[in-house]
Amino acid sequence: MNVTSGMDQILAQLKATSDLAAGGSKPSATVSTVSQADFGQLLKSAVDQVNTVQQTASQLSREFVGGNQDVELHDVMISLQKANVSFQSMIQVRNRLVTAYQEIMNMQV
């Protein structure tokens, strides 16, 4: 599973939960297509993948700066951009989780 598909699944679950909280309607078909993996496991897996991408980018960068002739500049730049995009995506997921949590906490019982 790549970072994008994991985050898509998380966002689909968040949207379905938000729809349920807002309208009290039945879960959408999106929820049933999401794998039966635990939400916490999906989130942990996505965070681990982002961490791996960042570590790889950092390692390539260190090797390039250290003078390793096998590491090309374009490989370093691509790796750094992948790490940046995956980290920014994770930040957006975190922001949506916080917003969803705040909405749930503000609901009247």
From Swiss-Prot:
A Gene Ontology biological process term: bacterial-type flagellum-dependent cell motility
GO molecular function, one term: cytoskeletal motor activity
Pfam family, one: FliE
Coiled-coil residue spans: none
Main location class: other
Keyword flag Cell membrane: no
Homology family: Belongs to the FliE family.
Name of the protein in question: Flagellar hook-basal body complex protein FliE
Entry GO terms, CC: bacterial-type flagellum basal body
Protein keywords: Bacterial flagellum
Subcellular location: Bacterial flagellum basal body
